[in-house]
Amino acid sequence: MNPIAFHVGNLAIRWYGVIISMGTALGLLLAMYNCKIREASYDEFINMFLIAFPSAIIGARLYYVIFEFEDYRDNLINIFNTRQGGLAIHGGIIFGVLAVYIYLKYRKESFFEYVDVAAPSIILGQAIGRWGNFFNSEAHGGPVTKEFISKFPQFIQNGMFIEGTYYHPTFLYESIWNFIICIFLVYLLKKTKKKGIVFMAYIGLYSLGRFFIEGLRTDSLYLGSIRVAQLISVLGIILSIFFIYNIIKKEKRY
């Protein structure tokens, strides 16, 4: 699989960056639609995005580097090279949400109103972004038989044939799951006015899918013998259930 999309002079533009940019652009278009559903300010959303996006990129990189520091110890300058991947979504979510919380608190705007609107866009970006992993030949699962992989389209078979072995296209599993979540979240955004429900549903549903898919991957980040993504996913599921229960319980009081 060729990771290079095209060249600008001597500069190679990788598919990874092109796909991340595409996911971001489509996420912003979806947010415009979702802001109308909730009657939220799209201008305020863009201001929030301009703070959240770089914060998320920094967080995603730092999170990855912390757990893979041995790969960078002897060449620290490579920490700043993200063109070949090395972004951990959990770090991006944590840093991005924290930046948004601080910004909206400063602006005296409702945190949950805007993260509810953002949730479908975030998961859409993740669904599209996983295809960047495909072109980088990363984030795949363990070895599979030719008979198993033959059930997938030919281009998936070709991309998952790495150094003489076929691998689970886990990027595809997560991408499909994320697209399903995106559709559900847009539906939920239309159906409920309870602030926080949509965002916490995003956290819970993404965590649920990621927990199972992570078990198939061969490139997981570890904390001792524990897959970090699975640990964070369990915490995400618990957190979402706790918040959704309390949001609904609070609404019933009034």
UniProtKB/Swiss-Prot annotation:
Q: What taxonomic classification does the UniProt entry list for its organism?
A: Bacteria, Bacillati, Bacillota, Clostridia, Eubacteriales
Q: Which residues cross the membrane?
A: 11-31, 49-69, 84-104, 109-129, 169-189, 196-216, 228-248
* Metabolic or biological pathway, per its Swiss-Prot or TrEMBL entry: Protein modification; lipoprotein biosynthesis (diacylglyceryl transfer)
- Extract the coiled-coil ranges from the record: none
Gene Ontology MF terms in the entry: phosphatidylglycerol-prolipoprotein diacylglyceryl transferase activity
Residues at which a 1,2-diacyl-sn-glycero-3-phospho-(1'-sn-glycerol) binds: R130
- For this UniProt record, give its keywords in alphabetical order, as a comma-separated list: Cell membrane, Membrane, Transferase, Transmembrane, Transmembrane helix
What membrane topology is annotated for this entry? Multi-pass membrane protein
Q: Which GO terms describe its biological process?
A: lipoprotein biosynthetic process
Function comment: Catalyzes the transfer of the diacylglyceryl group from phosphatidylglycerol to the sulfhydryl group of the N-terminal cysteine of a prolipoprotein, the first step in the formation of mature lipoproteins.
Q: Into which family does the record put it?
A: Belongs to the Lgt family.
Q: What is this protein called?
A: Phosphatidylglycerol--prolipoprotein diacylglyceryl transferase
Entry keyword annotation includes Transferase:
yes
What GO terms fall under cellular component here? Answer: plasma membrane
Entry EC no(s)? 2.5.1.145
